[in-house]
């Protein structure tokens, strides 16, 4: 049985976009579209400087849709008046048939170079590989990252920098990927030389997509993907990467820190710059080494003392 989807579009002032987008991501667990800019599920295009934006969330077309619509209306009514230029307009719901959704979104996903050697390409696109390129093939489905979003991109760049600085030019093992999504970070870790990688996600569908992408890239023998909880995993990981929401990073701070080996790396993203200090405070036992930013997003790279 295929699932049809509902697109819920809300027209809001530009200043309200981040707040509404964060709310929709947490509410739906799926990608969010903002005019012609797509977060996480799609590639990044130029967002025109217009006073009003159409922010779009995506939900399965089922019995929960009406409840979700009401929650979005409540958020708009409660939050909107605090933003200049806000005028309430009810969300517009559009039904997207599964076969249209599954194919039409793909036009937004093109090969993208990240860092010096990593290239992410969808399975349906051709790419002429250059010498030294490490090409990650991804078929992300509809709800998991392509690698083009700034948070994923900064994590990939951090992994590549660690690789360049490491002995032998290979990423140290073992590696832990928390909230693996489509598996793109685990695949990159394997291509960068890590020989033992653990990928975990609370969503069984994310794990299924990850396992398919691991096979697609020929690294399934290097990565163990599962829904195993963080507290069930051992410590001793030389690299831990977690690209999840800031609030979750803070909630899991002790567990994440405990999984890092002495001298090891902890890479965190999914953090809005305004929440950077909030996250840093939760990891104050570690040394902050790098803090790149892109758009409104921040990435934090820590090292654990020996």
From Swiss-Prot:
<dbReference type="GO" id="GO:0005737">
    <property type="term" value="C:cytoplasm"/>
</dbReference>
<feature type="binding site">
    <location>
        <position position="152"/>
    </location>
    <ligand>
        <name>S-adenosyl-L-methionine</name>
    </ligand>
</feature>
<keyword id="KW-0949">S-adenosyl-L-methionine</keyword>
<dbReference type="GO" id="GO:0016279">
    <property type="term" value="F:protein-lysine N-methyltransferase activity"/>
</dbReference>
<comment type="function">
    <text>Methylates ribosomal protein L11.</text>
</comment>
<keyword id="KW-0808">Transferase</keyword>
<dbReference type="InterPro" id="IPR029063">
    <property type="entry name" value="SAM-dependent_MTases_sf"/>
</dbReference>
<keyword id="KW-0963">Cytoplasm</keyword>
<feature type="binding site">
    <location>
        <position position="179"/>
    </location>
    <ligand>
        <name>S-adenosyl-L-methionine</name>
    </ligand>
</feature>
<dbReference type="InterPro" id="IPR004498">
    <property type="entry name" value="Ribosomal_PrmA_MeTrfase"/>
</dbReference>
<dbReference type="Pfam" id="PF06325">
    <property type="entry name" value="PrmA"/>
</dbReference>
<feature type="binding site">
    <location>
        <position position="243"/>
    </location>
    <ligand>
        <name>S-adenosyl-L-methionine</name>
    </ligand>
</feature>
<comment type="similarity">
    <text>Belongs to the methyltransferase superfamily. PrmA family.</text>
</comment>
<protein>
    <recommendedName>
        <fullName>Ribosomal protein L11 methyltransferase</fullName>
        <ecNumber>2.1.1.-</ecNumber>
    </recommendedName>
</protein>
<keyword id="KW-0489">Methyltransferase</keyword>
<feature type="binding site">
    <location>
        <position position="201"/>
    </location>
    <ligand>
        <name>S-adenosyl-L-methionine</name>
    </ligand>
</feature>
<dbReference type="InterPro" id="IPR050078">
    <property type="entry name" value="Ribosomal_L11_MeTrfase_PrmA"/>
</dbReference>
<dbReference type="GO" id="GO:0032259">
    <property type="term" value="P:methylation"/>
</dbReference>
